[in-house]
Regions:
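Terminal C-lobe "cap" of eukaryotic-type protein kinase domains
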Residues: 269-294
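C-terminal region of N-terminal signal peptides and the immediate post-cleavage residues
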Residues: 339-358
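Conserved N-terminal boundary motif of the eukaryotic protein kinase catalytic domain
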Residues: 9-19
Length: 360
């Protein structure tokens, strides 16, 4: 069913499976009888995010509907790209005519990894949040991640290109942080955005803008603008190459490439108009990647303690440092599901398909 070209699903038609996660904004459930399909075909299993009553009281329903309608209102190629690379809301869900949440796709398997703990044992499958990479190489290798310097530069280049395309579409991320970014290194380094119901689209935002601690723009600056995204891209570049979660010192980045050091210093400046746009980072990052080591980070069999923000349970859990506030969504809670798409296809209730399977 569509309303004004926006896919709408009645809550009563959803066959909900297990609860996948719960966060400050709501709860995410497996959906066993729906599929989400992007503009150019293919499809993924669906999950459902139900907002809490306090969040619903702040929700701009029209802005959420505009987000859902963006892939279909773009060119087929552009909509497909958005659906494949981001957690874009796929359909509005209503209960008795009132919006209560939205559908989204399952996280691609390649953006998850086998988390290892004490004794090099596999703890389970976890989202590959970029936050894990803001620690020293011994910790990264110890929890089971295989990442080289070249991978880090290529991840940043992919992120810069993605932000550049976002901005051309009128999308600003706002709460751009490693908690809201997933990554993979195979078949090539790439990022995947989650918590996309929190972005700003053409000036409108479905939810009040919030920021992850230590990833805030300078005081007094408007949130979720191209300039704020540029600031946080510079922060991430500094911290990803510096293996640090709170640093603002571009020295480590500059040691790889003086040009990248200059971009970082300009990007962290307090004059929003003087910050380099994401597209200006792409070529220098790719150039640095060609010179960077391809040797994966090495570590001990037991994961070490993260340099900052270690989890309360101590090292060895492999858990990224916890968010100190409620945050912008159910980023980690969304463990298995995110959004992207347009057309919803019903399946037989007893035939839930595997993640990544094509629609049929």
């Amino acid at each position: 069913v569509t309303a004004g070209g926006v896919p709408v699903v009645d809550h009563g038609t959803l066959a909900l499976g297990r609860r996948l996660g719960q966060g400050g904004q709501g709860t995410v459930y497996e959906v066993t009888n729906k599929r989400v399909t992007p503009p150019q075909g293919g499809g993924w299993d669906a999950v459902y995010k139900e907002y809490t009553p306090p969040v619903l009281a702040q929700l701009d329903v029209a802005a959420l509907e505009t987000l859902v309608g963006l892939p279909g209102g773009s060119t087929a190629a552009q909509g497909q790209w958005l659906c494949e690379r981001t957690a874009w809301p796929a359909a509005v869900v209503r209960r008795q005519g009132v919006t209560c949440g939205f559908l989204m796709r399952a996280v691609p398997e390649r953006f998850m990894f086998d988390l290892r703990g004490l004794g090099n044992t596999v703890v389970g499958r976890h989202l590959a949040n970029m936050e894990y990479l803001l620690n020293d190489d011994a910790y990264v290798a110890g929890i089971g991640l295989v990442v080289s310097d070249r991978d880090r530069f290529q991840l940043l280049a992919d992120l810069a290109e993605t932000l550049d395309r976002f901005h051309a579409m009128g999308v600003t991320v706002g709460d751009l942080s490693p908690k809201n970014l997933l990554f993979t290194t195979a078949p090539r380094p790439a990022c995947f955005f989650i918590d996309c119901d929190a972005v700003r689209l053409r000036g409108a935002t479905a939810l009040p803008q919030a920021e992850t601690p230590d990833w805030e723009v300078p005081a007094g600056e408007r949130k979720a603008t191209p300039a704020s995204d540029a600031y946080k891209l510079a922060l991430l570049a500094v911290r990803l190459l510096g293996r640090h979660q709170t640093s603002t010192d571009p020295a480590a980045l500059a040691s790889y490439s003086p040009e990248l050091g200059r971009l970082a210093r300009a990007g962290l400046g307090h004059d929003p108009a003087a910050r380099p746009e994401p597209g200006q980072w792409t070529a220098p990052l790719k150039a640095a990647s060609r010179k960077a080591s391809t040797r994966p980070a090495q570590g001990n069999a037991r994961p070490g303690r993260p340099r900052t923000g270690a989890p309360p349970g101590g090292a060895g859990t492999g858990t990224p440092p916890p968010r100190r506030t409620q945050g912008v969504g159910v980023a980690v809670a969304v463990a298995l599901g995110l959004a992207a798409l347009l057309v919803l296809e019903a399946q037989d209730d007893d035939t839930a398909s595997a993640p990544g399977a094509s629609a049929g």
